[in-house]
Amino acid sequence: MPKTKLASSVELSFEEPELFVHMYDFAVEITDEFCQIAFPGAFHPAFLLVKLYHILLSVISMGSIIYFFLNYSNLLAFHFNIKILFFFQFCSCFLQSATLAISQTHHLVLALIANGPCDVILAPALFALFNLPLIFSMLCMEFSQVLMVIERTLASCLFVCYEKTTKTIGFVLTSFAVIVPGLTCLYMYYDDKFNYPQMSAMATSPSSKLRINYIFITINVLNVLTLMHSIGLYRHNKQKINMVKGRDHFILSSRFQMNENVSSSKLLWRLSCAQLIIFLLYGCAMYSLRIFLPGERSAVWQAVTEFCYTPPLYCAIMPLICIVCAQNSLKQRNSKVQSLITLRSVGQEGWDNYQGMLQKQWE
């Protein structure tokens, strides 16, 4: 609730919106009555708790990403082309988390020190400064996932010569991972002046709402296709490596790459599954709120809307999935090394093992 004011401060609070209007050219007239109707949740405890939740989640996400880079990034022995896309998605998640943490901290402090309902309105430039990185980083997370699946498809189909190729494919795909989200943001906001009063960086400008809906529908379709393709890619690589498992004369580099294709495609379908669930949950939540909570936006409606902003969940889950995959990869590697160490090399048993290896080599 807004703080209680004396008569003199009440008079001042009615002047503040007037000063704000003269300072910024908003699309609508800013009055206390408008702010109380448009932003009923500005001082609601549930709304403030959601902001605190996003701050904590973002801090945890950034900490998890840093922890992964320091302790587990070297355990994923991937080709440069997939690794650069993989790290680009981590950077996108870090940008999403950092922007969300800063913006929500600003909104929380602003709500706590505000004297009136119009004090929580963001300046147009500040809203754009917070909103654009959130949208851009979210699109980068999505398109980098699609491009990683494309890269693994090329690696699986061209596994004989892919190791000999240069890093050009990785740089080209990473450039697309930046350019496509940038052009998408340009399409979404090319005529948006960011002059509609907003109290949250996650709000949608009325002039861009329809185009944003189209983009999110496209993202959900891409998530479904990416998940299906990544699962098929994993099964294909698994079958391929099973076919050559007993062939010791198979080229070592090709066998290593096939093992890499299996581990990377397995990680990709797990990430794609998490991304699909989280982004689909976000879209379903938004449409459900519009259906089941129609009419004027109450304080609870605004709190639930912010709570349903689920992309930060992916930023928190992605490092955990990668850490688990890296640990499993390390265990499998140690298990294979241990099995070779325990193989007898002396006596009759050692001679039998040696003959068996020679026989497999010449088959």
Swiss-Prot record:
<dbReference type="GO" id="GO:0004888">
    <property type="term" value="F:transmembrane signaling receptor activity"/>
</dbReference>
<dbReference type="GO" id="GO:0016020">
    <property type="term" value="C:membrane"/>
</dbReference>
<dbReference type="InterPro" id="IPR019408">
    <property type="entry name" value="7TM_GPCR_serpentine_rcpt_Srab"/>
</dbReference>
<feature type="transmembrane region" description="Helical">
    <location>
        <begin position="304"/>
        <end position="324"/>
    </location>
</feature>
<dbReference type="Pfam" id="PF10292">
    <property type="entry name" value="7TM_GPCR_Srab"/>
</dbReference>
<feature type="transmembrane region" description="Helical">
    <location>
        <begin position="214"/>
        <end position="234"/>
    </location>
</feature>
<comment type="similarity">
    <text>Belongs to the nematode receptor-like protein srb family.</text>
</comment>
<feature type="transmembrane region" description="Helical">
    <location>
        <begin position="273"/>
        <end position="293"/>
    </location>
</feature>
<feature type="transmembrane region" description="Helical">
    <location>
        <begin position="169"/>
        <end position="189"/>
    </location>
</feature>
<protein>
    <recommendedName>
        <fullName>Serpentine receptor class beta-17</fullName>
    </recommendedName>
</protein>
<feature type="transmembrane region" description="Helical">
    <location>
        <begin position="75"/>
        <end position="95"/>
    </location>
</feature>
<keyword id="KW-1133">Transmembrane helix</keyword>
<keyword id="KW-0812">Transmembrane</keyword>
<feature type="transmembrane region" description="Helical">
    <location>
        <begin position="120"/>
        <end position="140"/>
    </location>
</feature>
<dbReference type="GO" id="GO:0007606">
    <property type="term" value="P:sensory perception of chemical stimulus"/>
</dbReference>
<keyword id="KW-0472">Membrane</keyword>
<feature type="transmembrane region" description="Helical">
    <location>
        <begin position="46"/>
        <end position="66"/>
    </location>
</feature>
<dbReference type="InterPro" id="IPR002184">
    <property type="entry name" value="7TM_GPCR_serpentine_rcpt_Srb"/>
</dbReference>
